[in-house]
Design a protein with these regions (language model features):
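Conserved active-site-proximal phosphate/metal-binding subdomains
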Residues: 62, 72-110, 116-220
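Active-site entrance/lid segments in N-terminal catalytic domains of soluble metabolic enzymes
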Residues: 1-105
Length: 220
């Protein structure tokens, strides 16, 4: 019954098909839904690929687009080399290119990744963004349902504690340094079964399940 699905950690190429099948099941029960589809992209190239594929195969387009830049937390849609090469100014050019496409198609576009202050929001508004996505800013609030231990890790983190890790998903990710990451770097494995959540993950070789790790983190 959700109103929209925001999908990232890879290109959601078959998202329209998955949602359409779910809507058909609901329709058979007399429930009519029109779920909005919102892909997360990091480059104009990724957006072009999604738009072209969705239009050709499903005759549909995104209802909104979220752009996540190289300063975002969690999974990042960049290679390690790209993370090193992008500057705020050079990534602004990427954002402008994405915005030119979304404006052309009259699709709202929201920018995220390193958005923390009013000045950040005003900067992206000046570029033409319709809104901003903010997550880290609100993790430590009372309204966030994460554990206090999880929130405390954010509060106590210093700049040097923020590290880039290689996720089992196959993408780089930004995380807070902790004992768990030290153990992974030392070669320990924490696989206790596979949830089959991501096709690019090989449970025989990855050191841990990303879904389990995220759940354990938020639960403290």
């Amino acid at each position: 019954g959700v109103d929209c699905i925001v999908s990232g950690a890879g290109l959601p190429m078959n998202l329209p098909e998955i949602v359409h099948k779910a809507e058909e099941v609901l329709a058979a029960s007399g429930i009519r839904r029109a779920t909005k589809l919102v892909p997360i992209v990091s480059t104009r190239k990724a957006l072009d690929v999604i738009i072209k594929y969705w239009k050709k195969k499903y005759d549909t387009t995104p209802d909104m687009v979220v752009v996540e830049g190289p300063q975002a937390g969690g999974h990042l849609g960049f290679t390690p080399e790209e993370l090193d090469s992008y500057t705020p100014a050079s990534y602004d050019e990427e954002i402008k290119s994405i915005l030119s496409k979304t404006k052309e198609m009259q699709i709202p576009c929201v920018v995220g990744g390193g958005v923390y202050t009013r000045q950040d929001w005003e900067h992206y508004a000046d570029l033409g963004a319709d809104g901003v996505q903010m997550a880290t800013r609100f993790v430590t609030t009372e309204e966030c349902d994460a554990s206090m231990a999880y929130k405390q890790a954010y509060i106590q983190a210093k700049k040097e504690d923020i590290v880039i890790v290689k996720s089992p998903v196959g993408m780089p990710g930004r995380a807070i340094h902790n004992v768990f990451l030290d153990k992974v770097r030392q070669g320990e494995r924490f696989m206790r079964g596979c949830r089959q959540c991501i096709t690019t993950c090989n449970p025989a070789t990855v050191p841990y399940c990303i879904t389990e790790a995220l759940i354990n983190a938020v639960e403290g």
